Design a protein with these regions (language model features):
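A residue-level marker of the well-folded mature domains of exported/periplasmic proteins
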Residues: 1-131
Length: 131
């Protein structure tokens, strides 16, 4: 690993951070962004530096969230992999909190379905993506 840096979960900071890292390192093989907004910023910085992603011999770009915009970039081959972080889990969490506050018993474990999106499977999911 060459470096670990934060883009503070924003597109602007993601772009700034990626631009700085591109200035520090000549050969970046893999870029992992912990959310799609930082990835969008990183993509801007990469484009401005003339660096393409996703293809053979190009940096691999991995993102987290699974937003529709990111899935479109997966389909285009700009992002190699996007791992879902389902925003709909908040409703379940609110129900669990309400149940606990009401003194009701809740399950000890809950599992949310998450997906991993690649160019090979993204077409199955992109049309139904509502976030």
């Amino acid at each position: 690993m060459l470096a670990s840096a934060t883009g503070e979960f924003t597109q602007t900071k993601g772009k700034e951070t990626m631009a700085r890292l591109l200035g520090e390192f000549d050969d970046i093989d893999v870029i992992v962004c912990q959310n799609d907004d930082m990835t969008f910023g990183a993509i801007e910085a990469l484009k401005e530096a003339g660096v393409k992603t996703g293809g053979v011999g190009e940096p691999v770009l991995i993102s987290f969230d699974g937003t529709r915009k990111a899935l479109e970039l997966v389909k285009e081959g700009v992002i190699n992999v996007d791992v879902e972080c389902n925003p709909n889990s908040g409703e379940l969490l609110a129900q669990i909190i309400n149940d606990l506050e009401a003194g009701r018993e809740v399950d000890k474990a809950y599992y949310m379905e998450e997906k991993v999106f690649t160019k090979e499977n993204v077409d199955e999911y992109i049309e139904d993506r509502n976030y």
